[in-house]
Amino acid sequence: MALLEIRNVTRRFGGYTAVDNVSIDVEAGEFFTLLGPSGCGKTTLLRMIAGFDLPDSGQILLDGKDMVGIPPEKRPVHTVFQTYALFPHMTVADNIAFPLKMAGKAPQEIKKRVNELLERVHLPNFGNRFPHELSGGQKQRVAFARGLVNRPRLLLLDEPLGALDAKLREEMQIELINLQKEIGITFIFVTHAQDEALALSHRIAVMNRGNVEQIDEPSKIYSAPRNHFVADFIGKISVMNATVMEAVPSHLKLAIEGLGEVTAPAREGMEVGDKGVLAIRPEQVRISHPSNESQLKNHFRGKVHDFLYVGDVTTYIVELANGAYIEALLPNSAPGRAKFFEVDDEVTISWRHDAGIFLNDPE
């Protein structure tokens, strides 16, 4: 039995459905992420798990017990917010100890647990400091410690890294992974940042307009998206209109509108005549000078429309003969690289037969 079972949960606000008949199972010890754009329902769902809001229908079961109607303070759940929510008039130690004091724990136990958590979050000598004396990353660590001090069954994290700068956010991701491994408590993490979800999670639920589009491991979410929304939301894709010409267990043969035929990975349920798009990620696309004609079967000529230099790689936007645009990444440390391609340069783009994915759902 899963630790957390969300069964057909719906939440409406007037005529607007924020969460629409959602069902999710979360296993004990799992780092599970709710990922989606603003307004997709992820925070509303988190609030219902915490008890700050109630579903209009459905069940939320924790260890098999229905949580609907149980107030937040009575649930074995704690929430860490993006704003830290630290008490400014309390020291770090008192902030961490607050949930234990409210629970009536003995002073000796409180001191022991607080010191243990300060060690775990790498702030052993910060107990007597006040929040205004801490950096953003230190405040976030204190918030994590306070969330863990009463040993909840679930720790809910509502975009906790959103207020941090990029470098600190990356450092905190590593700390969060290590902390979850050490403690073994189930984390449910809410974010709109795809890179965070991919880096942190055991599994991800991608949400859109109140629905769950796909639940899977990060690698499968990225490489085998279930539909166009998931493919487009997770990372970058280029799409080309395509029709299935051949569908066999080993591969699909697709006719790309206005260009020619390519080979793509097989997908269950596809039939000859199905129309959709071939979605391909920039890192799967090779770009070369036309004189170095690709040995790959999937290749077309094009012209550089634009490019974006971002330090370690350059992203090239190539216009194909049918007017479609496809992005390609080229490492700036590529062996033998003499110069960048320039706008209007003629190029060849190519990709392996096992790259890309055919999607035939509406965008």
From Swiss-Prot:
Keywords: ATP-binding, Cell inner membrane, Cell membrane, Membrane, Nucleotide-binding, Translocase, Transport. Gene3D superfamilies: 2.40.50.100, P-loop containing nucleotide triphosphate hydrolases. Its EC number is 7.6.2.11. It is an enzyme of class 7 (translocase). ATP binds at G36, P37, S38, G39, C40, G41, K42, T43. It catalyses: ATP + H2O + polyamine-[polyamine-binding protein]Side 1 = ADP + phosphate + polyamineSide 2 + [polyamine-binding protein]Side 1. GO terms for molecular function: ABC-type polyamine transporter activity; ATP binding; ATP hydrolysis activity. It holds the Pfam family TOBE_2. Residues 4-234 form the ABC transporter domain. It is found in: Cell inner membrane. GO terms for cellular component: ATP-binding cassette (ABC) transporter complex. It is a peripheral membrane protein. Its main location: membrane. It comes from the Bacteria. Belongs to the ABC transporter superfamily. Spermidine/putrescine importer (TC 3.A.1.11.1) family. The complex is composed of two ATP-binding proteins (PotA), two transmembrane proteins (PotB and PotC) and a solute-binding protein (PotD). Part of the ABC transporter complex PotABCD involved in spermidine/putrescine import. Responsible for energy coupling to the transport system. This is Spermidine/putrescine import ATP-binding protein PotA. The gene is potA.
